[in-house]
UniProtKB/Swiss-Prot annotation:
Transmembrane segments: none annotated. Belongs to the class I-like SAM-binding methyltransferase superfamily. rRNA adenine N(6)-methyltransferase family. RsmA subfamily. The keyword rRNA processing applies. This is Ribosomal RNA small subunit methyltransferase A. It comes from Bdellovibrio bacteriovorus (strain ATCC 15356 / DSM 50701 / NCIMB 9529 / HD100). HAMAP family: 16SrRNA_methyltr_A. Specifically dimethylates two adjacent adenosines (A1518 and A1519) in the loop of a conserved hairpin near the 3'-end of 16S rRNA in the 30S particle. May play a critical role in biogenesis of 30S subunits. InterPro entries: KsgA/Erm, rRNA_Ade_diMease-like_C, rRNA_Ade_Mease_Trfase_CS, rRNA_Ade_methylase_Trfase_N, rRNA_adenine_dimethylase, SAM-dependent_MTases_sf.
């Protein structure tokens, strides 16, 4: 039995809990995967740490060894109580409804999590909406979601999540994790990604999100058709749009999946949302 499986067994006995399907709990038990996550966290040189969903502590115990301020966000009341008894600060709240500004004090904050799969895409969007926020993230995803986040131009997986995440982060694959690396085993493969904040020309990130959503609203439609509503809203013409596409090297028949994140930003800037 791996050290992580032994630790999970001890922690579950101490907490008197089992994984809750309703909360998307699949506890990580692979020493190899855990160590790769921790190594990536250390590579980002954090000054403070935030972990969502610590569970029985597969990552938490090793994060504590870094001797850095650590904030835990845990929705499961039994698990939250367990970590409070150990003297840690635990915010017992939904990570998607939390005001994350409380974590941003000018220090280099790194966010790490074996994310519940049902909130993973939303978490990435929420952190990407922030002009100032966490410096880096190391997060576990369902493999297909991870592939969408790192999706490339003209691929089936390239879409809203790809463009929006890549516009604000340098994203790399850290490691893969199979069903056997979790207890209970999920039905899907998983992948860990690292995110490092990059400079962006986009100031109004909410408007950019709306822009990209409209662009991918109907994949088979031409980009100029998907953005026709925004053109009207901004009192712009389709002819202007065709000209901007030409500047980027595209014909008027271009579709959203043909533009890179940088090209999306360049096109967006013509719409006057900033």
């Amino acid at each position: 039995m791996s050290y992580s499986r032994e630790r999970l067994q001890r922690a579950q006995e101490a907490m008197g809990i089992a994984a809750k399907k309703s909360l998307g709990q699949n506890f990580l038990v692979s020493d190899t995967v855990i160590n790769r996550i921790i190594d990536q966290v250390k590579a980002f040189a954090p000054e403070e740490l935030v972990e969502v969903g610590p569970g029985p502590g597969a990552l938490t115990d090793l994060l504590l060894e870094l001797n850095l301020p650590l904030q835990l966000i845990e929705l499961d009341s039994a698990i939250a109580a367990y970590w409070r008894e150990k003297g840690l600060t635990v915010i017992e709240q939904d990570a998607l409804r939390l005001d994350w500004k409380q974590f941003y004090t000018g220090k280099r904050v790194v966010f790490v999590s074996n994310l519940p799969y049902q909130i993973s895409s939303s978490i990435v969007i929420e952190r990407s909406l922030e002009n100032e926020g966490v410096a880096a993230m190391v997060l576990m995803f369902q493999k297909e979601v991870a592939q969408k986040i790192r999706g490339t131009v003209d691929s089936d997986l390239y879409g809203l999540l790809s463009v929006y995440a890549q516009a604000f982060w340098k994203i790399e694959t850290v490691t893969d994790a199979g069903p056997r690396d979790f207890q209970p085993p999920p039905k899907v493969a998983s992948r860990v990604l690292s995110f490092e904040r990059i400079e962006s020309e986009v100031k109004n990130r909410k408007a950019f999100l709306t822009f990209v959503k409209c662009a991918f609203a109907q994949r088979r439609k031409l980009l100029k058709k998907n953005l026709s509503g925004l053109l009207s809203q901004k009192k712009l013409t389709e002819e202007q749009m065709v000209g901007w596409l030409a500047e980027l090297g595209f014909k008027e028949t271009a579709r959203a999946e043909e533009l890179s994140p940088k090209q999306f930003v360049a096109l967006y800037k013509h719409f006057g949302f900033e």
